[in-house]
Amino acid sequence: MSDKPNAVSSHTTPDVPEVAATPELSTGICAGDYRAALRRHPAGVTVVTLDSGTGPVGFTATSFSSVSLEPPLVSFNIAETSSSINALKAAESLVIHLLGEHQQHLAQRFARSADQRFADESLWAVLDTGEPVLHGTPSWMRVKVDQLIPVGDHTLVIGLVTRVHAEEDDESAAAPLLYHEGKYYRPTPLGQ
């Protein structure tokens, strides 16, 4: 699996400063070195979908994380320059899909131009609550948007999980899809 997506959200942390106009960040570190270090950290691949009121919106994100078990909270972040940012900020709920190794095509599709993401209607349906949901995803969670926190050049989204779905069939129970050094991977266990 070596195809590169057109765009994938990157990790940020609350103490990361905004990018300065020069190749150096405001802390004096080289922006290229910072990006290179982050590329070396593998991440699970998710697709976030929501209903904007005028149609479905979705994007690929690698910044997903669990935050709390009680209450069940999750997080991800989105760039302020994303074509999906305004719809996300207006959304009350969304669905986070944890992609399987067999779903690289979805990661790439939702990293493309917004008008192409939902073009193939055979790939998704609509939940009774209105959010688009992708077929064949090993796990997905319906999330109520709890907090939107501006952090540097991104917005950190904290969501309360209100519904969890896990597929039982063999294909959907496949290993998760990972993103590392600009490529997609499947995890393999170390020798035991």
Swiss-Prot record:
Pathway membership: Sulfur metabolism; dibenzothiophene degradation
Gene Ontology biological-process entries: dibenzothiophene catabolic process; pyrimidine nucleobase catabolic process
Impact when changing T62N: Flavin reductase activity increases 5-fold
Binding residues annotated for FMN, in chain numbering: T60, A61, T62, S63, N77, I78, A79, E80, T81, S82, S83, S84, A111, R117
Cellular component annotations (GO), alphabetically ordered: cytoplasm
Pfam families: Flavin_Reduct
Keyword Cytoplasm in record: yes
Source taxon at top rank: Bacteria
Catalytic reactions on record: FMNH2 + NAD(+) = FMN + NADH + 2 H(+)
Compartments it resides in: Cytoplasm
EC number: 1.5.1.42
Biotech use: In association with the dszA-dszB-dsz operon can be used to remove sulfur from polycyclic aromatic sulfur compounds found in gasoline and diesel (biodesulfurization), which are a considerable source of pollution. In addition it may be possible to engineer the operon to make specialty chemicals. Can be engineered to make it more active, suggesting it may be possible increase the yield and rate of the biodesulfurization process.
GO molecular function: FMN binding; riboflavin reductase (NADPH) activity
SMART domains xrefs: Flavin_Reduct
Record key words, sorted: Cytoplasm, Flavoprotein, FMN, Nucleotide-binding, Oxidoreductase
UniProt key word Flavoprotein: yes
Region (Disordered), start-end ranges: 1-20
PANTHER family named among the record's database cross-references: FLAVIN REDUCTASE, FMN REDUCTASE (NADH) RUTF
Protein's job: An NADH:FMN oxidoreductase which supplies reduced FMN for the '4S' desulfurization pathway that removes covalently bound sulfur from dibenzothiophene (DBT) without breaking carbon-carbon bonds. Provides DszA and DszC (DBTO2-monooxygenase and DBT-monooxygenase respectively) with reduced flavin (FMN); has no activity on NADPH or FAD. The pathway substrate specificity has been augmented using mutagenesis, however no mutations allowed use of alkylated thiophenes.
Family: Belongs to the non-flavoprotein flavin reductase family.
The protein's name: NADH:FMN oxidoreductase
